[in-house]
Amino acid sequence: NSYNDEGYADFDKVILEDDFKRGIERLKVGCAKNYKIVLLGAMQEPIRCPRAILLGRELIKEGFNVKHIMHEGDLKTQDELEEQLLEKYFEERNQLTMDSLLGNAMSREDMIKESYKLANKEIGYRIEKLKNK
């Protein structure tokens, strides 16, 4: 089950599912055949859509060249979307703080990981919790 106790789909669990892995393999096969593959999402803003937060991140890990077609027609890379996530969730990341002075500040990589988790929490498909009978 990919749903966590809070009732939303946990993308860290989804990526471990056989169906998800098979889907990634199908994309690899299609690319190996030189198909031009486009994945459509429901949201105009990719950072609000699982295609970027779930799929885009995993496709980058698998070596795909991921570009998001924006509403206006321009393209954004997954790296550019990660910058947007950092700006949204860690807008004060470049400020001098006691933690940064003491060497306890989060690394950029950790902030990106946390940003994906926070975005997942916001956009993950939700189900009603079943009450124990």
PLM regions and their residue ranges:
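Residues lining hydrophobic/aromatic ligand-binding pockets adjacent to catalytic sites
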Residues: 1-133
